[in-house]
């Protein structure tokens, strides 16, 4: 439902031409640095992020890639179900998908962040670490998600699962920044969260008159796919990267020949993420009605055809989680998910219900959000488990209470979340609220010069334009009405019928606004006058 995502990365734009002019940028281009386009090399899992380091200098590496856990710390079996606290199926479905994201789960189970975090209270990384640890090390049980996970977002009604997912990812990314308040915007794209979920778009315009080429690079955390004319994910991706001809009224104003001329424009993935979040745009921007069509998606997806360098060998991703919406409209329905445990077995995670499933069932769903991981990453994590490198449960009691074929034991009370400090919830609400998150997105729409369906403005040749983020760290004052509508923790386990929630999702105004972007997630303020 939303194709925008908040994040704090930078954007770079290059112009390189067969005929270079010696025009000097005027005073308005205060952030422009002259540079030459870096020589490209074949992309690999190890070099894709490095290419972005060449695009602009990075003053500080916030999370060196070598710090990412390489071996799996996850238990092989499936973990706990999540109690529905009242219209929170969207929270549960999203949390389960994040919990079974191998690089994220391994980092959380390593406890590396909490050992060095100076915030603790109000830190989304610490909160997610506690949740993932409890969920994975309490198989056969039902646990209550912490209030702090949805503080500032949940308002007593059902919301958009994708919005909550990216709200949480953004909060985790911001949690990587305390202590690095003055870092440049390019360094902020080196956070652990960006290394897991992030990559870079490349928007290229080629003037057909003088053959000048303009490249714009912009970060992403997820990819939204238009499915109205697509029967499969591959078709939607092909449509996304299909070259567009700019002519007539849409002719390109070239910065070299200084005239409006025909041009071709192409959007491709310049660097790939370790984990791909693909969002299928299933809801009408006007009516909110659901596009209830079957869109095929594969268990293994080769992303190489959609990269800037398509001839460097396969880039295979494997499916490990699927988020599903059941219903006919964005105004009601129910969310649940399918996840692939480390052992390779698929499970349906429907609030408290955890049942074994099959890949056939998984691939037959009307998916809303698809989660893919690079095949090499998945195999490395799976291999470490098969070799017995799985550590003892961190802080969890020894138990052999395992779910048989995914069936949960109902003869025990739900595991309660630790009593929360009121200051924790208050601070979390102050720092990140749903209204403020949507406000930021409204203020940071996709720039015309990057939108694949719009014509870019004129830029001087042979320049590097550094676009700083418009997102501010400061948040709104605490809203008592939102505080009062936080999760109502109950000790009772809901029935399946009770968990079939109906509620109003995000406003249609937000949906219409979000559709204007072309599958991009960082909304940059252009610090130069065009």
UniProtKB/Swiss-Prot annotation:
Pfam families, per database record: HABP4_PAI-RBP1, UCH
GO cellular component: cytosol; endoplasmic reticulum; nucleus
Gene3D superfamilies documented for this protein: Cysteine proteinases
Region span, Disordered: 382-413, 509-530
Annotated USP domain residues: 80-375
Annotated Basic and acidic residues bias: 382-392, 398-413
CDD domains: Peptidase_C19E
Biased composition (Basic residues): 510-524
EC class name: hydrolase
GO terms for biological process, alphabetical: protein deubiquitination; proteolysis; regulation of apoptotic process; regulation of protein stability
PROSITE patterns, A to Z: USP_1 (PS00972), USP_2 (PS00973), USP_3 (PS50235)
Family: Belongs to the peptidase C19 family. USP17 subfamily.
Function statement: Deubiquitinating enzyme that removes conjugated ubiquitin from specific proteins to regulate different cellular processes that may include cell proliferation, progression through the cell cycle, apoptosis, cell migration, and the cellular response to viral infection.
Protein name in UniProt: Ubiquitin carboxyl-terminal hydrolase 17-like protein 20
Record lineage: Eukaryota, Metazoa, Chordata, Craniata, Vertebrata
Gene label: USP17L20
């Amino acid at each position: 439902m939303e194709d925008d995502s908040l994040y704090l990365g930078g954007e770079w734009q290059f112009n390189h031409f067969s005929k270079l002019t010696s025009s000097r940028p005027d005073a308005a281009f205060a952030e422009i640095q002259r540079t030459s386009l870096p020589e490209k090399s074949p992309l690999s899992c190890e070099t894709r992020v490095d290419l972005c380091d060449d695009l602009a200098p990075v003053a500080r590496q916030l999370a060196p890639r070598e710090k990412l856990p390489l071996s799996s710390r996850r238990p092989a079996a499936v973990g706990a179900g999540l109690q529905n606290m009242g219209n929170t199926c969207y929270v549960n479905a999203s949390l389960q998908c994040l919990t079974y994201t191998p690089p994220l789960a391994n980092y959380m189970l390593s406890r590396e962040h909490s050992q060095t975090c100076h915030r603790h209270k109000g830190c989304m990384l610490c909160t997610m670490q506690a949740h993932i640890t409890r969920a994975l090390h309490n198989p056969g049980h039902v646990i209550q998600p912490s209030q702090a996970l949805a503080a500032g977002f949940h308002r007593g009604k059902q919301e958009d699962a994708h919005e909550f997912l990216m709200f949480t990812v953004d909060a985790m990314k911001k949690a990587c920044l305390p202590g690095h308040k003055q870092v440049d915007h390019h360094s902020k794209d080196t956070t652990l969260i960006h290394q897991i979920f992030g990559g870079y778009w490349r928007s290229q315009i080629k003037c057909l008159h003088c053959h000048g080429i303009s490249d714009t690079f912009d970060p992403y955390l997820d990819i939204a796919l238009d499915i109205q004319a697509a029967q499969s994910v591959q078709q939607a991706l092909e449509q996304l990267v299909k070259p567009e001809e700019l002519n007539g009224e849409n002719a390109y104003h070239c910065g070299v020949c200084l005239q409006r001329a025909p041009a071709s424009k192409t959007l491709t993935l310049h660097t790939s993420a370790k984990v791909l979040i693909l969002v299928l745009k299933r809801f009408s921007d006007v009516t909110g009605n659901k596009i209830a069509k079957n869109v095929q998606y594969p268990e293994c997806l080769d992303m190489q055809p959609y990269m800037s360098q398509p001839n460097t060998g396969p880039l295979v991703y494997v499916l490990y989680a699927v988020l599903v919406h059941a219903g006919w409209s964005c105004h009601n329905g129910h969310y649940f998910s399918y996840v692939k445990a480390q052992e390779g077995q698929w499970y349906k995670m429907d609030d408290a219900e955890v049942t074994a499933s099959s890949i056939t069932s998984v691939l037959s769903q009307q998916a809303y959000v698809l989660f893919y991981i690079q095949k090499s990453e998945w195999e490395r994590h799976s291999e470490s488990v098969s070799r017995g490198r799985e550590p003892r449960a961190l802080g969890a009691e020894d138990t052999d209470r395992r779910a048989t074929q995914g069936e949960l034991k109902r003869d025990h009370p739900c595991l309660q979340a630790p009593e929360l400090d009121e200051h924790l919830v208050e601070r979390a609400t102050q720092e990140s609220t749903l209204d403020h998150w949507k406000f930021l997105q409204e203020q940071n729409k996709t720039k015309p010069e990057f939108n694949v369906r719009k014509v870019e403005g004129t830029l001087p040749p042979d320049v590097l334009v550094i676009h700083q983020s418009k997102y501010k760290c400061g948040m709104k004052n605490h809203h008592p009405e939102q505080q009062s509508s936080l999760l109502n923790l109950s000790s009772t386990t809901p029935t399946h019928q009770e968990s079939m929630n109906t509620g109003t999702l995000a406003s249609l105004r937000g949906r219409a606004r979000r559709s204007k972007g072309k599958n991009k997630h960082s909304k940059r303020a252009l610090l130069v006058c065009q």
